[in-house]
Amino acid sequence: MLRDIDSGVSSAWVSSFADDTRVLAGVSTVEGVVALQEDLEKIYQWAAQNNATFNSTKFECLRYGRNKSLINSSKYYSNTLTEIESKPSVRDLGVTMSADGSFADQISNVTTSANLKCWWILRSFITRDRMPLVTQWKSLVQPILEYCCQLWCPNSPGLIQKLEKVQLNYFRKISGMSDLDYWDQLKRLNMYSLQRRRERYIVIYVWKILEAKVPNFGIEAVASSRSGRYCRVPLLKTTAASSTRTIRFRSMGVNGLRLFNAVPQHIRNMSNCSVETFKGALDKYLKQVTDEPRVPGLIKYCSRGSNSSVDQ
């Protein structure tokens, strides 16, 4: 049984899904490198005892951190005693994770796949009427752009615009939309921007965590008679590199909690109800919050004209 694959593992976290196994550990010293290799050896022993095999040619190692000397000097070995190759990015369950933590490769892959799907739709259907093209967009393209978006997020204005331009270019092909500004297109089609949709989904996901409908990854909820239920947002270390702070700030563990706290109290306090009921109340509120930057159009710096619900 795969459920006991982590038996004897002391310093790492082991996860298995289908025929893939992942081993995660925080390593900051040479002793940590040795401990992680020992945990790998225990997993290899478990595989031998249970007549399981690992394909050493598919072993990949992704390393995060600023300690380049430790990263460059440490080596890990597979069950065949071959060195496990370090990769700048690794694809896991459809999400590409990069060593710099930016998810730029993931967004590049997502936008490429979404654009190919858009071109296929526009080549396959002669009509440019609103209803069929919007239906195709919602059914075939949106799932590509929003897959597992609670994990990855654009952490720079350029990446945000790269995603939005997929929707912008597609909506331009709809009859009567080519001469309209992007935000006017969204209003005419009664659609959200992709940034607003990601934020909406993250708020719903945080609510599911608080309602114990999905696993909790460390969110701490606080309730008071004056402020209602809200999430305690962890502080960012001022000693960390600016790029690290940006990535951390954009993550669900920080920005997701800020988004949830920005929702009105009566929505945050909703409990013991269905997900659809919460979605209905949230959508009713979001219709009152403008989904348009203070500077019209696709802007260069989102800080000057953000359409985030937190900044409204």
What is each model feature region?
Residues F17-D20, A47, V90-D100, A114, ...:
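Short, conserved catalytic/metal-binding micro-motifs enriched in Asp/Glu and His
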Residues L81, V134, P215-N255:
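Amphipathic alpha-helical
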Residues S10, T21-A48, P154:
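Catalytic palm subdomain of template-directed nucleic-acid polymerases
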Residues M1-L24:
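Active-site palm subdomain of RNA-directed nucleic acid polymerases
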